[in-house]
Amino acid sequence: MILWIATFWLVGSWIVPFLAHAAGFSKETLTHRGQALYSLLTDITEGLAGIAILHQCLGRFRPLPPGWFEFNLKGKWHLDVAFGCLLFPLVNLLSHINISLVPMSPGPVVGVSSVEQSIVARDPVAMALYAVVVTVCAPIWEEIVFRGFLLPSLTRYMPLPWSILASAAAFALAHFNAQRVMPLVFLGVVMGGVFARSRNLLASMVLHSLWNGFVFLDLMK
């Protein structure tokens, strides 16, 4: 897990920016569409690097035990996803509570994010690229890491409920945002529960995608 975090940081903070600079691009001077494409390529690179690390580290444990990285279109996992969606308002409520408990630290005013700038500018191409990042890329690789790998790994050392909670806490902390810890922990528990019930990683991916889409659409209001 530490190796994955280090790889994620190295790729996103150093390798991709270095390659972009070597190619003659500067993120600060890119257009809305350029920044959106940059974010998409960065996310894809981080995801592929993380999956490659997992593939390499799990090589000596193959064949993997049943239940690891299970994908299945069949079954009643749609009902589990639907139930998870019903909890979205509670996640939203926890987000507001968390923000009230952890106000922004004093210091320089943080600028508007590139996502918000694209939404304000109503650039359809940039918004579509960001939509792919948050509803496709992020759910796939985050669920592979936290529900596909970490949660089953933790069940070797603790009961399933504690494994779900621990993987949810790791999921929240990996976002490096104190103002979002409470909703992300709860969301991680919900997605972990959906995965545990359905034994299907596709279920938690779809739920994750729907939540991210819900947040993205809320930003567009």
Which positions does each model-derived feature cover?
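Hydrophobic alpha-helical transmembrane segments
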Residues: 2, 40-41, 78-85, 128-132, ...
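Hydrophobic alpha-helical transmembrane bundles that constitute the permease/transmembrane domains
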Residues: 10, 43-48, 141, 161, ...
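Alpha-helical membrane-inserting segments
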Residues: 11-24, 49-57, 90, 94-98, ...
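Juxtamembrane helix-loop-helix connectors linking adjacent transmembrane helices
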Residues: 17-44, 58-138, 156
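Hydrophobic core segments of transmembrane alpha-helices in multi-pass, intramembrane catalytic enzymes
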Residues: 46-50, 130-133, 184-191
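Solvent-exposed interhelical
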Residues: 152-164
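Functionally important transmembrane alpha-helices
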Residues: 161-221
